[in-house]
C-alpha cells in the first residue's frame, strides 16, 4: 500500500470480508442509514472501524454522525467497502474523478483508473461516465473492484436513458435512475436539487454562466418545461429511496462559479441557501448529507465561502472542487487549485475534489491522475497539520528524522509518492552506495549543513558558557565534539 493512502495498515482486508455480515441483518429495514443508527445511540461496526482509522473515540464518531457533521458513505450493497469518514472532526479527504466519455474508455479501462486512483491515495472516487458505453456495466465493475466509497451523478444517465432528449425527460426518469444507482451499491450521489427556476435569472452578468454539467441539464429542463426542478419537488421521495440503502446525498452546487469574476455572486449564494434547507430536510429522514462547493474562488474569499456554507448548511460536511485561485494557468490547474484546496481545508472543508493538469483542456490520462492526486494529498495533509488533527504531523516528523540521519530509503518509504522521490534522487546518484551517503547532489559531499551534527548536548554546553560569561569581554572557547 502506498503511503499516500489513508487506510490504516492491516485493516484494509478484513472489513471487506466482514462487511457483508455487518449489513445482512439490516437489509429490508425501512431506514438503514448510519445517521439513523447513530441517533438511536448505536455504534455500528462501520463507526467503530472509522474510529480506529481516525484515532477518535467511538462515542465521538457516533455523536458527529448523529449531529450531521460527519458522514460515513457506505451503501449496504457495497460490501467490499472499507468504511471511512468525511467531516470536520476527521482527517481532510480527497476525491478523484474517473469515468467513460462518449469518445473514450470502457469498463476495464475505468477499473484501471480506479485502481490507480486508490494507489495514489484517493479516499473516494466518483464515476462521472456520461455515455458511449454501457453505463450500468461500467458502474457495476467499478463498485465491485472498489474498497473506497463510489459517488455518481445520476442526471447524466437519466438524460442518456432518453437519448439526450430534454423534452422527453420526466420526473420519474430521474427517480428510476437514482434508485438503480442505490441498488448497484453507489455510496453517495450528487443530487442537483438546490437549483430553482427562480435562480436562473441571477446567472445574468456572469462570464462563464453555468459550468456544472448536471446543473446545465436541469437548467435546460426547467427552461424547456417552465416547471420547477424535479429533484427539488421530489426531494422527499429521493430521501425515502436513500434511507433504504444508506446512500448519502452530495448536494450539488449547480451554480458554482466557473471563474474568479463569478465567485460568491448572488446566484451561487441563493442556491447555497436552498442547499441548507435541503440538508435539514434530509436530516429529518435521518439521511446523511454533504454539500458541494466551488469552484473558482480568489484567495481572499475562500474563508468566507467555507464559513457561509457552515452557517447556511448547519455544519454539514463541505466538499469543494479546488477551488482554483486564478484562471490563467491551463495545464497547471492542479497547482492553482491545490493552493485554494489547502486553504479551504484549513478553514474546515471536509473533502477536496482533485483537479488534474488537464482541467479545462481534455480527458486526464494516468500521469494526470497521479499528479492531481498527489497535489491534493499534499493540500489535505497540510490542512490536517494546520487544524492540529490527532497524529497529523507524525509522519512529517518521522521523515524529518530520517532526512537528518541520511536514511534515504526511509525517506522514500515515508513520502507521499515514494516512486517519484526515489526517481529524482537517482537521476544523479543512482548507485546503491549513495543510499548510505550523507549528502545529495544539491550540496555534494562537503557542504551539507546537516553533516555538522551539532547535538543538544553541544548546545547545552554552549548555554552554560554563555551564562558563565555574561558581561565578560570575551567568551571562553567552546570545543564541539562532532559525531563520527
UniProtKB/Swiss-Prot annotation:
| Catalysed reactions listed for this entry | 5-amino-1-(5-phospho-beta-D-ribosyl)imidazole + S-adenosyl-L-methionine = 4-amino-2-methyl-5-(phosphooxymethyl)pyrimidine + CO + 5'-deoxyadenosine + formate + L-methionine + 3 H(+)
What are its GO biological-process terms? thiamine biosynthetic process; thiamine diphosphate biosynthetic process
Q: What class of enzyme is it?
A: lyase
Cofactor(s) it depends on: [4Fe-4S] cluster
One CC-aspect GO term: cytosol
Taxonomic lineage is: Bacteria, Bacillati, Cyanobacteriota, Cyanophyceae, Synechococcales
User: What organism is the protein native to?
Assistant: Synechococcus sp. (strain CC9605)
- Residues noted as binding [4Fe-4S] cluster in the record, renumbered to the chain: 440, 443, 448
Task: For this UniProt record, give its keywords in alphabetical order, as a comma-separated list.
Answer: 4Fe-4S, Iron, Iron-sulfur, Lyase, Metal-binding, S-adenosyl-L-methionine, Thiamine biosynthesis, Zinc
Q: In which pathway does it act?
A: Cofactor biosynthesis; thiamine diphosphate biosynthesis
Q: Which family does it belong to?
A: Belongs to the ThiC family.
Q: Name one Pfam family in it.
A: ThiC_Rad_SAM
Instruction: Extract the GO molecular function terms from the UniProt entry.
Output: 4 iron, 4 sulfur cluster binding; carbon-carbon lyase activity; zinc ion binding
Read off the Gene3D superfamilies from this record. Answer: 6.10.250.620, Radical SAM ThiC family, central domain
Residues annotated as binding substrate are 97, 126, 156, 192, 212-214, 253-256, 292, 319
Under which EC number(s) is this enzyme classified?
A: 4.1.99.17
Query: Which cysteines bridge via disulfide bonds?
Result: none
What is the name of the protein in this document?
Phosphomethylpyrimidine synthase
Amino acid at each position: 500500500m502506498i503511503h499516500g493512502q489513508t487506510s490504516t495498515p492491516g485493516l484494509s482486508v478484513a472489513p471487506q470480508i466482514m462487511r457483508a455480515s455487518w449489513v445482512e441483518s439490516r437489509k429490508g429495514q425501512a431506514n438503514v442509514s448510519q445517521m439513523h443508527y447513530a441517533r438511536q445511540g448505536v455504534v455500528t461496526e462501520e463507526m467503530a472501524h472509522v474510529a480506529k482509522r481516525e484515532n477518535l473515540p467511538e462515542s465521538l464518531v457516533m455523536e458527529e454522525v448523529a449531529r450531521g457533521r460527519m458522514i460515513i458513505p457506505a451503501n449496504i450493497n457495497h460490501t467490499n467497502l472499507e468504511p471511512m469518514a468525511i467531516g470536520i472532526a476527521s482527517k481532510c479527504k480527497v476525491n478523484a474523478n474517473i469515468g467513460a466519455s462518449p469518445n473514450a474508455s470502457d469498463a476495464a479501462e475505468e477499473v484501471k483508473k480506479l485502481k490507480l486512483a486508490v494507489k495514489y491515495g484517493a479516499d473516494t472516487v466518483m464515476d462521472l461516465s456520461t455515455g458511449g458505453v454501457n453505463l450500468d456495466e461500467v458502474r457495476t465493475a467499478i463498485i465491485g473492484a472498489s474498497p473506497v466509497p463510489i459517488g455518481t451523478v445520476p442526471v447524466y444517465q437519466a438524460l442518456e436513458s432518453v437519448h439526450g432528449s430534454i423534452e422527453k425527460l420526466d420526473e420519474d426518469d430521474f427517480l428510476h435512475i437514482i434508485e438503480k444507482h442505490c441498488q448497484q451499491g453507489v455510496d453517495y450521489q450528487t443530487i442537483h436539487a438546490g437549483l430553482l427556476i427562480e435562480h436562473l435569472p441571477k446567472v445574468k452578468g456572469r462570464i462563464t454562466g453555468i459550468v456544472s454539467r448536471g446543473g446545465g441539464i436541469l437548467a435546460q429542463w426547467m427552461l424547456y418545461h417552465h416547471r420547477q426542478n424535479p429533484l427539488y419537488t421530489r426531494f422527499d421521495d429521493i430521501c425515502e429511496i436513500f434511507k433504504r440503502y444508506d446512500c448519502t446525498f452530495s448536494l450539488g452546487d449547480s451554480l458554482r462559479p466557473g471563474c474568479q469574476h463569478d465567485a460568491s455572486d448572488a446566484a451561487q449564494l441563493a442556491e447555497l441557501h436552498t442547499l441548507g434547507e435541503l440538508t435539514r430536510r434530509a436530516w429529518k429522514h435521518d439521511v446523511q448529507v454533504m454539500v458541494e462547493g466551488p469552484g473558482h474562488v480568489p484567495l481572499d474569499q475562500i474563508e468566507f465561502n467555507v464559513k457561509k456554507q457552515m452557517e447556511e448548511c448547519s455544519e454539514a460536511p463541505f466538499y469543494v472542487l479546488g477551488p482554483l485561485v486564478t484562471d490563467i494557468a491551463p495545464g497547471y490547474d492542479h497547482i492553482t487549485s491545490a493552493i485554494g484546496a489547502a486553504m479551504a481545508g484549513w478553514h474546515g472543508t471536509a473533502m477536496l475534489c482533485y483537479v488534474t493538469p488537464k482541467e479545462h483542456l481534455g480527458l486526464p490520462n494516468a500521469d494526470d491522475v497521479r499528479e492531481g492526486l498527489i497535489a491534493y494529498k499534499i493540500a489535505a495533509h497540510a490542512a490536517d497539520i494546520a487544524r492540529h488533527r490527532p497524529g497529523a504531523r507524525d509522519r512529517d516528523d518521522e521523515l524529518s528524522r530520517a532526512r537528518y540521519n541520511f536514511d534515504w530509503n526511509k525517506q522514500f518509504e515515508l513520502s507521499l509518492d515514494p516512486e517519484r522521490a526515489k526517481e529524482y534522487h537517482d537521476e544523479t546518484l543512482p548507485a546503491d552506495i549513495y543510499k548510505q551517503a550523507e549528502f545529495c547532489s544539491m550540496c555534494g559531499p562537503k557542504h551539507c549543513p546537516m553533516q555538522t551534527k551539532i547535538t543538544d548536548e553541544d548546545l547545552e554546553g554552549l548555554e552554560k558558557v554563555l551564562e558563565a560569561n555574561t558581561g565578560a569581554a570575551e567568551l571562553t572557547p567552546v570545543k564541539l565534539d562532532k559525531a563520527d
